[in-house]
Each structure stands twice: as C-alpha cells, then as structure tokens.
C-alpha cells in the first residue's frame, strides 16, 4: 500500500485485492495431505489458472462489474512478471507491477529465512548466487 501511495494515481483497493488473491489457486493446487502433494487439478491447471476460476466464481456471486473483474484477472495472470517466469500475460498496469514486484521481493526475502548458522555465505539455487546471512 505504501508503494501505491508513493506512486500515486493507483487503485489501492485493486492492489490489495490482487495481493490477497494472486495465489489463491494454491489452495486447490496443493493438497493438505502429508508432504503437501499436488492435486490432479493442480498439476493439470496450475495455480494461476485456478486463481482465475476461483475469482470468477466469487465475482459472479458478488456481481462484480466486468471491467473490475478484468483488472483483477490481469493482476492474477501477470503476477509472475513475464512469460519466462510463468505468467500467461505480462504486467501492463501500475497495479499489476506493484503486486508482481511485492511478490518477487517477498520470495527473495524468504530465501534469507533458512541457512546454516555456521556459514554466513550460502549458495541459493533459486537465485543462482551466494547470499550473505548476517543475522
């Protein structure tokens, strides 16, 4: 929200909705069974498509205006940033970029959560670089 306020002329409600809902499909993609295996639906569709389905179902019940739904769907579809990272479409709105970069920063910061206390430097496969864990 702070980023949206700093940028200005941003639909903060849409940013919040996108931030809360961009990964909602993971609730159906990943099972709650031991080991958290993927569901059949999850393997076949993936969380992005499943998020769209869930949001469409809710939007129909709430009678969300079509234009508003389209803006939210764009955020969900583009939250990985670009095609190379798995997004079916690339970010095209301020709100989509804000949600994408917030999600990306969150994923990067999570890489600092687990490390070997004996070695402050650790190679991170996801980021393909060494990270310094100073605390």
Predicted feature residues:
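Divalent metal-dependent catalytic cores for phosphoryl transfer on phosphate-bearing substrates
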Residues: 3-115
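N-terminal intrinsically disordered, cationic/polar leader segments
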Residues: 100, 117-118, 122-135
């Amino acid at each position: 929200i702070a980023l949206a306020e700093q940028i200005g002329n941003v639909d903060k409600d849409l940013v919040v909705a996108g931030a809360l809902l961009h990964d909602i499909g993971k609730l159906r993609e990943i099972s709650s069974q031991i080991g958290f295996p993927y569901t059949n639906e999850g393997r076949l569709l993936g969380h992005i498509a499943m998020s769209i389905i869930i949001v469409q179902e809710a939007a129909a019940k709430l009678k969300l205006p079509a234009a508003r739904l389209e803006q939210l769907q764009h955020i969900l579809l583009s939250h990985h940033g670009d095609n190379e990272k798995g997004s079916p479409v690339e970010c095209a709105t301020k709100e989509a970029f804000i949600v994408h970069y917030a999600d990306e920063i969150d994923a990067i910061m999570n890489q600092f959560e687990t490390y070997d206390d004996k070695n402050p430097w650790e190679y991170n496969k996801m980021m393909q670089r060494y990270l310094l864990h100073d605390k």
